């Protein structure tokens, strides 16, 4: 929702509050002392600053403004000083050169409503011992190369189930909701790694849609522009309902987590012999954790699971949906990807994770999807812990820093034909998404790079390759590829507004 529309009267009332006028006068005095060194930006209105320029799609609004004011742009969003980064060079300064100074987070009002910033791997300051502990546990117990390799068979089985369900839909000549089936597959991969159970079922549409809608609502509420983020004294009002949505949806997820945690605790207490630790899942390892730091509380575990669950399911399923959307919109590109897969796998095989490295064009399709449809368009908001200089401009302490990776991915000075889906641009180039190339950083970079990146890349690539190998795809009757809906909804993540429906056609008889 637009942060101005629907609440204009209340914001106008706020304009005349004398206490706020005094506050803004004090703030403006601080800024003026270093004004010549600050990044350029658009003119500001009294009190609200540049909020009227944000709109429903901040990543697009900021990209347009950056064309005028440059790759390091200053905005005043209510009482919040903000700098928007929109070039690879500036992104390198933020994510690498000044990584330590700019690695703090700027939690949104929704996140603060459940004190998630005090226990979350995403929102805790990277300088804290708690963050280092959670990061270490996440990597060693879940996301290390060894752990990811150990769950390879699990991913293969879940993708086989996906292919089997789509095969049944093909037999019935039914279209498939790509968003839904991708989410279920990703959900079951994540839930098995975390809890050793399937949480989703392809044949339980109503129940699983509830989980998917809950996760998307959490991400939207956490990332949607909110008046309370810019006017802290408005927090108690929850003008746009983001706090209510965030609380209701996270509580719903936490109840699910707590059920599994309680069951595991009861199982451990009833066992006479210790369980084989090689069969432990992530929650088992967290419950068993003993370290130099204080032990993890159940609340700590719930907050960590909330991070893993929401980030791990929404981003991967959304990326697969965007990839399939672009391929259906560009049938020659889809045919080229399918021909490569058929050549490598053969006519009666099955796609294995080890095959992905032999599929450079498929890898290019995934990279091109991340370029055009980056899952987190502004990355997670950062906060300057001290003054920092970015490309000759001063970023003051406590300034919010947004890296507009969506804008960088569509910058004509960086990419030829930036609005076109052309995987060929990556062929023969040593460019990846691992945080080394600042033209393409969908997972961030530096100490704050998403630890789930390797798992996400394997999951998305395996699902996409399997769908393209097993089926030809066409749009529902009456829908033309050139008219395919590309509308998007902004939140902490960027997902397709209207789910993609496509009709699968079996490419070979032995699919089941």
Curated annotation (Swiss-Prot):
Locations listed in the record: Membrane
S-S bridge residues: none
InterPro entries (alphabetical): Cyt_P450, Cyt_P450_CS, Cyt_P450_E_grp-I, Cyt_P450_sf
Alphabetic keyword roster: Heme, Iron, Membrane, Metal-binding, Monooxygenase, Oxidoreductase, Transmembrane, Transmembrane helix
GO molecular function, one term: iron ion binding
PROSITE patterns per UniProt: CYTOCHROME_P450 (PS00086)
GO terms for cellular component: membrane
Residues annotated as binding heme: 450
Primary enzyme class: oxidoreductase
Membrane topology: Single-pass membrane protein
Co-factor(s): heme
E.C. number: 1.14.-.-
Transmembrane segments: 3-23
Protein family (similarity comment): Belongs to the cytochrome P450 family.
Protein name from the UniProt record: Cytochrome P450 76C1
Record organism: Arabidopsis thaliana (Mouse-ear cress)
């Amino acid at each position: 929702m637009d942060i101005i529309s629907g609440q204009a009267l209340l914001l106008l009332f706020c304009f005349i509050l004398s206490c706020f006028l005094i506050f803004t006068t004090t703030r403006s005095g601080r800024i003026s002392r270093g004004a010549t060194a600050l990044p350029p930006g658009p003119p500001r209105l009294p009190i609200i600053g540049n909020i009227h320029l944000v709109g429903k799609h901040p990543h697009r609004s900021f990209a347009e403004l950056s064309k005028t004011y440059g790759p390091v742009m200053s905005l005043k969003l209510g009482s919040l000083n903000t700098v928007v980064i929109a070039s690879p060079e500036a992104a390198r300064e933020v994510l690498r050169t000044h990584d330590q100074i700019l690695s703090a987070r700027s939690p949104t009002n929704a996140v603060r409503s459940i004190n998630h910033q005090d226990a979350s791997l995403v929102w805790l300051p990277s300088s804290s011992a708690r963050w280092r502990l959670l990061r270490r546990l996440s990597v060693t117990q879940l996301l290390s190369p060894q752990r990811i390799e150990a769950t390879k068979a699990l991913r293969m089985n879940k993708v086989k189930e996906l292919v089997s369900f789509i095969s049944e839909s093909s037999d019935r000549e039914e279209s498939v909701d790509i968003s839904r089936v991708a989410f279920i597959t990703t959900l079951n991969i994540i839930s098995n790694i975390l809890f050793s159970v399937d949480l989703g079922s392809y044949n339980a549409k109503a129940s699983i849609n509830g989980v998917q809608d809950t996760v998307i609502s959490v991400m939207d509420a956490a990332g949607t522009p909110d008046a309370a983020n810019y006017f802290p004294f408005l927090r108690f009002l929850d003008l746009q309902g983001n706090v209510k949505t965030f609380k209701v949806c996270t509580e719903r997820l936490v109840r699910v987590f707590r059920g599994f945690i309680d069951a595991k605790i009861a199982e451990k207490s009833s066992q006479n012999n210790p369980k084989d630790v090689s069969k432990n899942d992530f929650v088992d390892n967290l419950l068993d954790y003993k370290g130099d730091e204080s032990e993890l509380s159940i609340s700590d575990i719930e907050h960590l699971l909330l991070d893993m669950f929401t980030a791990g399911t929404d981003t991967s399923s959304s990326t697969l949906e965007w990839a399939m959307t672009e391929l259906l919109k560009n049938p020659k590109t889809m045919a080229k990807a399918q021909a490569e897969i058929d050549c490598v796998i053969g006519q009666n095989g099955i796609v294995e994770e080890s095959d992905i490295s032999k599929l450079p064009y498929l890898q290019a399709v995934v990279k091109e999807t991340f370029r055009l449809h980056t899952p987190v368009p502004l990355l997670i908001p950062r906060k300057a812990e001290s003054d920092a200089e970015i490309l000759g401009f001063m970023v003051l302490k406590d300034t919010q820093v947004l890296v507009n990776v969506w804008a960088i991915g569509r910058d004509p000075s960086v990419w030829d034909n930036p609005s076109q889906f052309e995987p060929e641009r990556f062929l023969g180039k040593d460019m990846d998404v691992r945080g080394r190339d600042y033209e393409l950083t969908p997972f961030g970079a530096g100490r704050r790079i998403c630890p789930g990146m390797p798992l996400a890349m394997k999951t998305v690539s395996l699902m996409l390759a399997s769908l393209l190998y097993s089926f030809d795809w066409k749009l529902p009757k009456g829908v033309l590829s050139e008219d395919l809906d590309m509308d998007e909804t902004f939140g902490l993540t960027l997902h397709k507004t209207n789910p993609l429906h496509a009709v699968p056609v079996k490419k070979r008889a032995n699919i089941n």
